[in-house]
Amino acid sequence: MGNKKMRILGINCMNHDAAMAVIDVQEGGDILWAAHAERYSKVKNDHFLNQQIVDEAMTYGPFDKVVYYEKPILKKTRQFWAGQYGLALDPKEMPLQHLKQFGINKIDEYVSHHESHAATGYYTSPFNDCVILTVDAIGEWDTISIWLGSQGKMELKERIQYPHSIGVLYSAFTKRVGLKPAEEEYILMGMAAYGQPIYKDKIQREFIQSSMPFRLKHNLHRGIGNWMPDADPMDLASSIQALTEELLANLWSRAASYLPAKSLLFAERNLVFGGGVALNCAANSKLAGLGIFDNIWIMPNPGDAGSSIGCVAASEKQYLNWQHPFLGHNIEGEYPVDSIINELEQNMMCGVANGRAEFGPRALGNRSLLADPRGPKVKDMVNQIKRRQKFRPFAPAILEEDVHDYFRLPKHVKNTPYMQFTAACVRGKDF
């Protein structure tokens, strides 16, 4: 192949949060570009691609290969088994049919959903040797998988399959409190801090058959109806959050059991955590504090959108040159530091759109609403402008060298620049 560049297009669509990525595998796995469809369509968590995102992807072409993040025939088999006959039998629900309208006429390789998740984490991680845990609502069939990563190769060790799913359980309670399942779980996580976990044991008794291996008593894909109709939604949120943390703690311990005894290869206990459930930063902090692992890597986009990168890495079995999540559309110009400071001093708030867009669900400074945290009014001001609930959390931004003066991070977490973990404030500090 000589010096010819080999560029691969990775695609995730036809599920929540469609995305595309371009990777140059001849240049050390450089991620040239990666973006969410929603950034172009303005439809939150858009399931489908659009002409605008495809056009931008094509500026990085031509492509030597197109890779898709899951296996649609397996997925349709599960949909048929679950009674979703309309989805299972509709040929328009096949990804290639969707892609053809944008001039993409072939998919060269299909990588399984959970392998894409696992590869997203492993091949962007700083580890050669680790255990990889993937937890989400559902892939084709898998809902939980454990892999051993060693010297650039992944080996599947254990899997749990549909309908037994921690992600589906959490989504069922998202729906129960009036939120949108498979989209607004992050709001449920925020609600949990305002309630008490008084229903945790009841949820476990009524819905869970066993914690390890994880088994549900019923298929909860369609929700739990109006279970406990008089319960305070905040208490329901707190209860399912606390139970989820317990279930994940069991899984982290189970994953750790696959690590070999300490050796030259496995000198430290390293975890890669992926899948949509890995976005639960409150749970991540509790779990990190248990000290099960020495080092933890959660790729900043561990959900389905990130698998547009992971499917390529899995296909090539190659580490990627991961530097940061600023991989999307570029708004050129010097970052307006002085203008931001002036705006914050005068009006307490400032919107920023500069540089390359974040690839992932968190606003990390390039597409962000910034606010001065001092004073009692700013919380309500931000919530009003964003049209969101009063209980929603905020992400502090601080110089890395000052973090430990103001915040207490979980055990084994040195910093958290991408919102994978939460931190406790150190009391008595003057802001």
Q: Positions of the model-derived regions?
A:
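Short, Lys/Arg-enriched N-terminal segments with co-localized hydrophobic residues
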Residues: 1-5
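N-terminal phosphate-binding loop and adjacent alpha-helix
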Residues: 37-62
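Short, hydrophobic/amphipathic alpha-helical packing segments
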Residues: 50-54, 115, 173, 244-252
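Active-site cores of enzymes that catalyze phosphoryl transfer or operate on phosphate-rich substrates
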Residues: 190, 198-242
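Phosphate/ATP-binding catalytic cores across multiple sugar-kinase/actin-like superfamilies
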Residues: 238-267
